[in-house]
A protein has these predicted regions:
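Alpha-helical transmembrane segments of multi-pass small-molecule/ion transporters
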Residues: 1-214
Length: 214
């Protein structure tokens, strides 16, 4: 029973933030016009700071073998999701273009905004760096296999050079040459503050989108 309560306690804050986002949208406080700019800000600034903060600040060791396993696991899990969704789309006899969009949307699970706070609350924040590395594999799959599914003629490897992926690679390099000790305190504080905003704002935006559907 205590485990069940622990899980409920861990899930409650993200769900509450979703609810707040939905209520703000319904009340006109979180307007649709703000979604695009806030989404870009979250993905290109807040999320990378979140990754950098937890990877560089992580006190444990990141063994290269485990690093590779986590990346491969993230990549394979999304590819399996795409495959299953494609199979379902074919069984439903969806149009080819619709099937591709369906498989892309259905094959991607919530690997970030909901996963981080729940996993951190249940297993401790020491798990978050591992989820970030896992997400590197997910991002690679989304920007390669996923983009190819949606539009094979627009598939470009340069799409892999985006802020979240770059921040992970940069964080790993900083860890190797000294870690947090080589980052000036004021810079570290800025990264910490920006990173702390990533999950709440992301969940508020998702909640706002849910509010549009109700």
């Amino acid at each position: 029973m205590s485990d069940f309560l622990q899980i409920c306690t861990a899930v409650a804050p993200p769900l509450f933030l979703l609810l707040v986002g939905g209520l703000c949208r319904r009340g006109g406080w979180l307007r649709v016009e703000a979604d695009a700019s806030l989404s870009i800000l979250t993905v290109r600034v807040l999320y990378p700071c979140f990754f950098f903060f937890y990877l560089v600040g992580h006190k444990g060791t990141l063994i290269p073998f485990h690093f590779s396993v986590l990346i491969c696991s993230g990549f394979i899990s999304i590819c399996l999701g795409f495959g299953v969704a494609l199979g379902v789309g074919y069984l439903m006899k969806l149009d080819k273009r619709v099937c591709s969009s369906f498989s892309f949307c259905s094959g991607i699970f919530n690997y970030g905004f909901f996963a981080f706070p729940v996993a951190g609350a249940i297993f401790g924040e020491q798990l978050i760096p591992k989820i970030i590395i896992f997400n590197l594999g997910v991002e690679i799959a989304v920007w390669t296999v996923g983009v190819y599914l949606l539009a094979s003629n627009q598939f470009k490897l340069k799409r892999l050079i985006n802020p979240p992926i770059v921040s992970i690679i940069l964080a790993v390099l900083v860890r190797e040459i000294g870690g947090q000790s080589i980052v000036p305190d004021f810079v570290w504080n800025i990264i910490s503050l920006l990173g702390a905003c990533a999950i709440p704002i992301g969940l508020l935006l998702i909640g706002g989108n849910f509010g549009d559907l109700i």
